[in-house]
A protein has these predicted regions:
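The structured alpha-helical core of multi-pass membrane proteins
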Residues: 1-393
């Protein structure tokens, strides 16, 4: 009976090998992706969009606006400045996100898990002092959980000011943007205790629509100024960084790094969605981001001498590069994308505090599980502290 069983197993293994061999090189490559930690599944790939890329997906809302504010307005955004900042943005996304996280960090996992504390668990045996950078990394993530809701949601709500139907209303009520932002933030934190499992399932599809929208509007503006792709040459970025045209000096890198906000989620959420699904979705995300940033750059080069825009305070190329009718869609999508990005970080903050508690780095706090999935946590004290801090920001 043992020999018969071994023979049957050998036949099954041979049949599998024959099946894989018959698929050809592409089929064999796809079979490898369907096994182990690199497995790709369409459903989890959609989930990865909502969990991993929400934060970095809202960066186009405010990165170029911050650049213009630092340079003194659109009048100072000449060809050298625009190509320079686009080059810095492109290569920052490439080096920090693609090279650092996708190609290097994601290979260093702790039994499939990623994140600062998972990395610490791998290296803690080399010295107790390594707890210090791990704590600093965790603290930086918690700070991001405060800043992201404030910046992303407020930048999205500011898009209402560019709509003709609401322009007069916001001009007469200067604090209206702040009040709407505060209301959305309060609603976001108030629903945490009830669990977000149901709406969380739709996050991936919404983020897919959002990135597709970014790519389309960026491409539409690129058709007016294709030469903006000269910024792919890193020489433009280095030259502008040390140029007299750069009013912000080296501090402009603070603006440039806004484009990589949330890149750490590719590593920290690797255990939730799978390494293969991140590998599979990242090329689409990067292309959409590059098209959107370069589309904004093309719009700036087309309008840098337009007196109507030069006099506009706090000009945001993201909304201005669209027609008024498209802006309505952009505002709705950007607000939803901002909420999704905030939700991912809030959930991540709960998980990180729980992990820090297990390491005895924080006092033991009350933890609730409002959803059927035990991995989804809710810590009332953390929720309240982040909410108040976000409102102050």
């Amino acid at each position: 009976q043992v020999l018969i069983k071994q023979h049957e197993e050998q036949q099954q293994e041979a049949a599998k090998l024959d099946q894989v061999a018959s698929k050809g090189p592409v089929g064999r490559w796809w079979s490898r992706l369907q096994s182990g930690p690199n497995r790709i599944t369409p459903a989890m790939a959609i989930v990865a969009l909502g969990v991993v890329y929400g934060d970095i997906g809202t960066s186009p809302l405010y990165t170029m606006q911050t650049f213009l504010n630092g340079q003194g307005g659109l009048a100072h955004a000449d060809r050298e400045a625009v190509l320079g900042v686009l080059s810095l943005v492109f290569w920052s996304i490439t080096l920090i996100t693609t090279v650092k996280y996708v190609l290097i960090a994601m290979r260093i996992d702790n039994k499939g898990e990623g994140g600062i504390f998972a990395l610490y668990s791998l290296v803690r045996k080399y010295g107790a002092w390594l707890a210090i950078p791990a704590m600093l990394g965790g603290a930086a993530f918690l700070a991001d959980s405060v800043l992201t809701p404030a910046v992303s949601i407020s930048s999205a709500v500011e898009g209402l000011e560019t709509l003709p139907a609401f322009e007069k209303l916001f001009t007469e009520n200067k604090q209206l943007t702040l009040m709407i932002t505060a209301a959305i933030i309060l609603m976001l934190f108030s629903v945490q205790s009830r669990g977000t499992e149901r709406i969380g399932k739709a996050f991936g599809s919404v983020v897919l629509v959002w990135f597709s929208f970014l790519a389309v509007v960026g491409l539409a503006n690129l058709s007016q100024y294709w030469s903006v792709f000269a910024a792919l040459n890193p020489v433009y970025g280095v030259r502008f960084l040390f140029s007299s045209h750069n009013a912000a000096g080296l501090a402009i890198m603070g603006t440039v790094f806004l484009s990589t906000t949330g890149a750490e989620a590719l590593y920290s959420d690797m255990g939730h969605v799978g390494r293969g699904n991140i590998y599979f979705t990242w090329p689409f995300i990067k292309i959409a981001l590059v098209l959107c940033y370069f589309g904004q750059g093309a719009w700036m080069l087309n309008h840098w001498d337009d007196s109507a825009y030069i006099r506009t305070h706090g000009l945001n190329p993201f909304f201005e590069m669209m027609t008024p009718s498209v802006r309505y869609v952009a505002v709705v999508l950007s607000v939803v994308a901002g909420v999704i990005a905030s939700q991912a970080l809030i959930t991540g903050a709960f998980t990180m505090v729980s992990e820090a508690t297990h390491l005895n780095w924080m006092p033991h706090l009350q933890v609730r599980y409002p959803a059927r999935t035990r991995g989804l946590l809710y810590i009332p004290v953390v929720n309240a502290v982040i909410c108040v801090s976000t409102l102050f920001v």
